[in-house]
């Protein structure tokens, strides 16, 4: 049985969020294909996620964290490390990700748990895992010339690889705010892509 951590980074509900329409469809199809797996839903806007304080930074940078699994910050780090698969559902906001998702990555980027330093630099500790990033964008930022403005999926994908997760897929519904676009078709196309990926994820 695999443990899937489903991280949601949007204050909107499932019906209002175009991202969540896609990610919820992915999760539902995944459950059909993998009924034995455990899905852990983590809605960041329903958690006490905040910017790290000086005291919290000192704690997570301490050498011995083995007895801190219930710490308000480190509990998220250990939860992340213990998962086998990851689903990140996020919109692109202002060319990047919502601040709460960045704060979450600060929570889970902890040496000795998700990565470590060696004489050759940082090495990820989360090997043999996989992730999918589900994203919606108002414009088109995955292809030239505006791909260089994409600090959303590139950041999330890079963080996964920093943790050692090399198998990272991306499902993106783009151009959702472009005048004249058939938004429903673009969302529907992304849902179809999600449905196919869910079966083999």
Curated annotation (Swiss-Prot):
Pfam families linked: Flavodoxin_2
InterPro entries hit by this protein: Flavodoxin_fold (IPR003680), Flavoprotein-like_sf (IPR029039), FMN-dep_NADH:Q_OxRdtase_AzoR1 (IPR050104), NADH:quinone_OxRdtase_FMN_depd (IPR023048)
Annotated GO MF terms: electron transfer activity; FMN binding; oxidoreductase activity, acting on NAD(P)H as acceptor; oxidoreductase activity, acting on NAD(P)H, quinone or similar compound as acceptor
Listed EC numbers: 1.6.5.-, 1.7.1.17
Keyword Cell wall biogenesis/degradation found: no
Cofactor: FMN
Residues reported to bind FMN: 92-95, 136-139
Highest taxon in the source lineage: Bacteria
Keywords: Flavoprotein, FMN, NAD, Oxidoreductase
Catalysed conversion reaction: 2 a quinone + NADH + H(+) = 2 a 1,4-benzosemiquinone + NAD(+); N,N-dimethyl-1,4-phenylenediamine + anthranilate + 2 NAD(+) = 2-(4-dimethylaminophenyl)diazenylbenzoate + 2 NADH + 2 H(+)
Cofactor note: Binds 1 FMN per subunit.
Record-stated family: Belongs to the azoreductase type 1 family.
HAMAP family referenced in this protein's UniProt entry, alphabetically: Azoreductase_type1
Function: Quinone reductase that provides resistance to thiol-specific stress caused by electrophilic quinones. Also exhibits azoreductase activity. Catalyzes the reductive cleavage of the azo bond in aromatic azo compounds to the corresponding amines.
Subunit structure: Homodimer.
Protein name in UniProt: FMN-dependent NADH:quinone oxidoreductase
